[in-house]
Amino acid sequence: MSVADFYGSNVEVLLNNDSKARGVITNFDSSNSILQLRLANDSTKSIVTKDIKDLRILPKNEIMPKNGTKSPSTNSTKLKSAETYSSKNKWSMDCDEEFDFAANLEKFDKKQVFAEFREKDKKDPAKLLVSHNKSPNRNYHHKQNVLGPSVKDEFVDLPSAGSQINGIDAVLSSSSNGHVTPGSKKGSRETLKKKPFVDENIPAELHTTTGDILKPITPEQLSQGIALAIAKTSTDIVVENAAQLLSQFVFSVLGGHKRLSSRNHNSQPLVCILVGSHDHASAAVAAGRRLCAIGIKVVLRLLTPFNVDNRQLLMFQAAGGYIPTENFDQFLNKLTSPIELVVDVLTGFHPSIDKNSHALIQWANDLNVLILSVDIPSGYTVQKKNTAILPKWTLALGAVTTTLAQAALVKQAAGVSVFVGNLGTGSQTWAELGILESQVTGQYLAQISCTSTN
């Protein structure tokens, strides 16, 4: 039995200051511990439970007085009339015993309630993303150990925060010697335009340049993994982790410390970030803020501002970032340096575009500058051929989706380097969803190549 069972009951509340209030219980706010009464004059009174000294349930046939609250200064005439009125209504026959919550709680049948929940739940347990519903792997890859370690380490040694950016530089610098050949930007575009967007088989495994094996996951699984990480930590932590990874990748692409050193007399690089409406929109703005803090000029081109945390936009502008409100091309003409890099964050890991996104994709391709796509090149779909953005690099935040893995098979020969970054949300988050094999371990960033296994 809960407080809700007493809604509509007439009660008399004795407060700590010896004042009384009579009324009908209309609501109880359990989070703030506030009891709400409707007094005789149809007004409402809210009482904090810590101020209640005693509470008495009145008979239903008892008539409440017009004044719901009586103060200690009530005159003797009113007290006498109240006593006379109470005797006429047989108040003396009321029960003064305390309510036994423990005894009434035992009347609550928990088993019956949970049985009703199970009857109403029509979901198929086999479709739930729970680790015990996942079929274990029967066959092992030739590079995998058949016998696992006998003792599982509770802590994993990870690189220090100071070595993170050096690790990204090392991965980028070795990309030309790995499975992917960067080539020239112009050559990449010509080859990409000749490649049709055919329905290739989704690769079962992803092989990194260091020999590790990852497995692609669906966009829905990636979305659930990020949502679970936010539930365990906070939105700000997940956003800042993604922003740090993206900003350090851009920093390395632009040349790192040598490009931004005071000894370099070239103008500051200008980066344009195309931001759409998706889960990583706020992370893209936060990455732009971090780039502004180290001397890189950043301009945002927002598809819509409604999916971005307003705090991130304010902090971005406070750091020196640009959010043009006028014609974008006219704004660029006022700047002293041209755009050096376009960061494509239009669609996130859901490959869908609208008319506005299509126009921005055409605009970015016509700039003939370096392009970095986040999660997946915008405009790519597995259903039909669409005009897609033509990046030199693609950075997957968290894990590689099956859509990106399929796109990489088509575009990899054209010189598109695909990377996957660890969001730092912890392996337990992904293990709960049964997709731990999608995570990069031992490093913050890894370059991948897709090979289908049959």
Swiss-Prot record:
Cellular component GO terms, alphabetical: cytoplasm; cytoplasmic stress granule; P-body
Localization: Cytoplasm, P-body
Major location (coarse): cytoplasm
Domain of life (superkingdom): Eukaryota
Span of domain Sm: 1-61
GO terms, biological process: deadenylation-independent decapping of nuclear-transcribed mRNA; P-body assembly
SMART domains in the record: FDF
The keyword Phosphoprotein appears for this protein: no
Ranges for domain DFDF: 87-123
Keyword list, A-Z: Cytoplasm
UniProt key word Manganese: no
Stretches for region Disordered: 173-192
Family affiliation: Belongs to the EDC3 family.
Function: Stimulates decapping of both stable and unstable mRNA during mRNA decay. Stimulates decapping presumably by preventing the DCP1-DCP2 decapping complex from adopting an inactive conformation. Together with pdc1, acts as a scaffolding protein sufficient for the phase transition of the components of the 5' to 3' mRNA degradation machinery to form P-bodies. Intermolecular interactions between the edc3 Sm domain and at least 10 helical leucine-rich motifs in dcp2 and pdc1 build the core of the interaction network of this spontaneous clustering process.
Known partners and oligomeric status: Homodimer. Interacts with dcp2.
Full protein name: Enhancer of mRNA-decapping protein 3
Organism this protein belongs to: Schizosaccharomyces pombe (strain 972 / ATCC 24843)
